[in-house]
Amino acid sequence: MRAFFTGYCTAFIRQDAPAIAKHFADMVHVTSDDERDVSVQIASAAEWRKIIDRLLDMYRAIDVGSVEAIGLATDALSPRLVQARLRWALTDKASRQLYEFDAMYTLARHTEKFRIIAIAHNELPEYRKCLARIKTEQRSPQ
């Protein structure tokens, strides 16, 4: 699992949407907590690719330079089904911490490779706080 998430993380650092998308199954169940509500959606590969593109746009808006998994725990439910919990840390291109968030993944191996079939995360509130902080800093005189 560590190698899988290292490749996943590297794809995010490179902002390589096709490489990120290759880590996901053809259908993905996504659950997001945005502090106001919990949204649940099922996305096809094409829909998920559009979401990845929007996420990368969000990362560019806050100048993400690095994404690091600072915590990883896994539970193998079977040889073909694994759950993973990760703590992610994002820094900007000047190596300043932006924010951290948690995500839980369910991965399935239908062939020789695992693919993410479900993800639950709490990233959106952390992103919004970070974006607001950056906008405030940009408006404040130095």
Predicted segments, located by residue:
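Hydrophobic/aromatic beta-strand elements that line small-molecule binding cavities or substrate pockets
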Residues: 69-74, 87-90, 102-108
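Short, aromatic-enriched amphipathic alpha-helices that serve as compact interaction elements
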Residues: 1-16, 23
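Generic short beta-strand segments
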Residues: 27-29, 85-91
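Hydrophobic pocket/interface hotspot
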Residues: 8, 20-21, 48, 84, ...
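Short beta-strand edge/turn micro-motifs at domain boundaries
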Residues: 98-137
